[in-house]
Amino acid sequence: MATWSGFNVSSSPLLRLRSSSVSNVTKLPFLSPICRRRLLAERFGLATVVVTRQNLTVTPSSAAVEARISGKREPMTPPYNILITGSTKGIGYALAREFLKAGDNVVICSRSAERVETAVQSLKEEFGEHVWGTKCDVTEGKDVRELVAYSQKNLKYIDIWINNAGSNAYSFKPLAEASDEDLIEVVKTNTLGLMLCCREAMNMMLTQSRGGHIFNIDGAGSDGRPTPRFAAYGATKRSVVHLTKSLQAELQMQDVKNVVVHNLSPGMVTTDLLMSGATTKQAKFFINVLAEPAEVVAEYLVPNIRAIPASGSMKPTYIRFLTGIKAYTKIFSRVALGARKNRYVTEE
């Protein structure tokens, strides 16, 4: 086996013929490791050359190079293994039902062991032994790690992890009037909890040969617009988009191709969280005009989520239920035709 510049070269005939070319490329200090590999792949045509400080290996690359260009891998075959945080009620529960209807296996969790038990029992009555549940406080790293262990014990691996757990502390008031407890609750759940879940989800999926997809759910404020009377909630949801982009960049820097972080936007969903804020004329107007039941939203989101692993796509995606066009169309219908007035709450 030949060596040069502190690197070992495999005895592949292809490498022996091209050794001078390889040496020239790997000695270019201004090229990143990724760029060097790309140049080597182009130079050899039929092989991807991976350089490490220990050895230089050759792997078949026609599919790999094509996957790098297209952003795709081999499609994942359903049924999928799904994990959803904050999934004993609201949109989380509706998503769980929709995945189960599609034939997938689902792990649900909540801070309340009682709610988990009730939700699992209800879902098992409808879908059989394809659902598991456990107590988990996403603001506690130990709980999240135990959630991963629980999922691996029952399902071996997770294909899709949806970070849905969130809180507004059921508090709608100016920030100046917010209590310490409410602010801590919102920030710990929506920001720290999301970070802990993303960290553990990525660490788990990086050990899985099939990788996986992580979806972070946004909310009011994620687009940068003001959220008066729930400023803390809006600020934490704005951070969701930033965190997702940062994680996408980190995975790209590490040349990770089989783990992807996406954003998921359910829009306005008629959950307890949303309806608790229907206290002003403006809030009631927009809830009636734009909000939809969790079941309707889940029916749209789940097929779009499942389509990503099914296609083999490994490109970051932002799936939106309520697009700008949909929102403006609904508002126009309301203003022009009076549509959806008093649909959920009575407007004064």
UniProtKB/Swiss-Prot annotation:
Disruption phenotype: Slower degradation of chlorophyll b during dark incubation.
EC category name: oxidoreductase
GO cellular component, one term: chloroplast thylakoid membrane
GO MF, one annotated term: chlorophyll(ide) b reductase activity
Keywords: Chlorophyll catabolism, Chloroplast, Membrane, NAD, Oxidoreductase, Plastid, Thylakoid, Transit peptide
Residues engaged in binding NAD(+): 84-108
Biological process (GO), any one: chlorophyll catabolic process
Transit peptide residue numbers: 1-61
E.C. designation(s): 1.1.1.294
Taxonomy, superkingdom: Eukaryota
Cellular localisation: Plastid, Chloroplast thylakoid membrane
Membrane topology per record: Peripheral membrane protein
Reactions catalysed, as given in the entry: 7(1)-hydroxychlorophyllide a + NAD(+) = chlorophyllide b + NADH + H(+); 7(1)-hydroxychlorophyllide a + NADP(+) = chlorophyllide b + NADPH + H(+)
Gene3D superfamilies xrefs: NAD(P)-binding Rossmann-like Domain
PROSITE patterns to which the protein is assigned, alphabetical: ADH_SHORT
InterPro entries: Chl_b_Red, NAD(P)-bd_dom_sf, Sc_DH/Rdtase_CS, SDR_fam
Main location: plastid
Job of this protein: Required for chlorophyll b degradation. Chlorophyll b, chlorophyllide b, pheophorbide b and pheophytin b can be used as substrates. Belongs to the chlorophyll catabolic enzymes (CCEs).
Subunit structure: Interacts with NCY1 to form a complex that acts as a chlorophyll b reductase. Interacts with HCAR, RCCR and the LHCII complex. Part of a SGR1-CCE-LHCII complex, which acts in chlorophyll breakdown.
Similarity remark: Belongs to the short-chain dehydrogenases/reductases (SDR) family.
Misc. remarks from the entry: Chlorophyll b reductase activity detected in vitro with a recombinant protein produced in a heterologous system. Able to act on the substrate within the protein-chlorophyll LHCII complex.
Record protein name field: Chlorophyll(ide) b reductase NOL, chloroplastic
Species assigned in the record: Arabidopsis thaliana
Gene: NOL
